[in-house]
Design a protein with these regions (language model features):
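Active-site neighborhoods and metal-handling regions in enzymes and metal-associated proteins
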Residues: 1-394
């Protein structure tokens, strides 16, 4: 189990919830360990996890067409309700292996008409027909929400996506292990991309090499911003046929997904000498991130972390440096809490995993960015990174 269930239960008690329902792709996967594929590839498909209070078993609600995913994923929740029609036949002349036996068992279970019918059935069996239920509002369609409220009129449904965010903010040891591996694979992809750096190589060719390394190491590409020269100042630069020239800066703002968990990091390199201004400005944004390591610890106000990082970059060489945020949490979603901004009311807690970043974009010049994945430890910070933060000269 990856989910921080003790934290979930504590927050449910605090918020007065008799049950909570996960509905969006990230929360369904996080809470159950089940990856409902259709949720991740298009909008609209419904999958839920019902998590009742003490004394009741949780339930996964999923479309019949996804039942074949259950044996390989082995979710920790054993009660799986299916809805919708899907035809699959069984060769009764052979002995089914364990995976096929489980599929046969699941396909032999009751098929509810739709996702809401399955959810309502599970709730009624557990006696959840009144009280207060938190529902993650980000994945359920308005039509399904209307049906759910009509079927259970005595329940007060309260939006609780923010509760799931608060739960996910504190990582379990297994989550931290996966995030560390995701970081290592992504760093390897940056190295792989830079291994082909020479005059004439295009941004697009570098991205292909980056993505290939991710895939070769069982990770999936998610973000691949790689820009050369003045194109590096494009905030969300998408690789083009721009060819690398001597003196060009190369900016990476990249990430992947490994076992459903995200990586997100930034590094800079240059083919030959990029010039004094780039060296000076890059050193400033690097020192901003390094200053974060000096002060990160449980209890630190996130707003204070923001202010100190910005002030460091300003002091170290970019006096006009300004940002809306200098990082964010990361986990099964690329932007878990906290958002490292001046307006944040959060404080750092042990076993948060955050991305600390100091991007600087100047059109006509360059984009400079350092971003590290960092775990908040009992008394400080632990980098999940192995690549040096300094500007790499090729």
């Amino acid at each position: 189990m990856l989910a921080n269930v003790p934290r979930l239960k504590a927050l449910m008690r605090k918020d007065g919830f008799d049950a909570v329902i996960a509905t969006c792709a990230e929360n369904v996967t996080y809470l159950s360990g089940f990856w409902a594929m259709s949720q991740w590839v298009r909008r609209g498909p419904q999958a839920y996890v019902l998590f009742p209070g003490e004394g009741h078993e949780p339930t996964i609600i999923v479309n019949s067409s996804l039942l074949d995913l259950v044996p390989d994923q082995n979710p920790w929740i054993s009660d799986i309700r299916r809805y919708g029609y899907f035809q699959i036949d069984t060769d009764r002349s052979v002995q089914l292996d364990a995976a096929d036996q489980l599929q046969h068992q699941l396909f032999s279970s009751k098929a509810y008409k739709n996702s809401v019918d399955a959810l309502v059935g599970a709730m009624k069996e557990r006696g959840i027909e009144r009280g207060t239920v938190g529902i993650d509002e980000m994945g359920i369609t308005p039509q399904c929400m209307d049906q759910l409220q009509a079927a259970l009129p005595d329940i007060k449904f309260v939006r609780c996506f923010s509760l799931f965010e608060r739960v996910r903010a504190i990582k379990t040891p297994r989550e931290i292990e996966i995030l560390r591996h995701a970081a290592r694979v992504t760093e390897g992809a940056i190295d792989a991309a830079l291994s082909i750096a020479k005059e004439g190589v295009t941004e697009r060719e570098m991205l292909r090499r980056f993505n290939a390394h991710l895939v070769e190491n069982d990770a999936a590409p998610v973000v691949g911003c790689i820009g050369f020269g003045n194109r590096s100042a494009m905030i969300n630069v998408q690789p083009s046929d721009r060819k690398l020239k001597n003196g060009d800066l190369i900016r990476f703002d990249v990430g992947g997904r490994y076992r459903h968990y995200r990586s997100d990091m930034s590094r800079g390199a240059a083919l030959g000498d990029p010039g004094e201004k780039i060296r000076k400005y890059y050193a400033a944004v690097e020192k901003g991130v390094l200053r974060g390591y000096d002060i990160i610890k449980p209890g630190l106000r996130v707003a204070d972390l923001f202010k100190e990082i910005v002030a460091t970059v300003q002091r170290e060489g970019i006096p006009h440096f300004a940002r809306s945020h200098v990082g964010h949490g990361i986990g099964v979603d690329g932007y878990d809490p906290p958002n490292i901004a001046a307006s944040s009311v959060d404080v750092l807690e042990e076993d948060m995993v955050i991305c600390v970043e100091t991007p600087y974009y100047e059109l006509g010049f360059a984009g400079l960015q350092v971003e590290d994945m960092v775990r908040v430890t009992k008394d400080g910070a632990e980098s999940l990174m192995s690549l040096p933060t300094g500007l790499r000269i090729l």
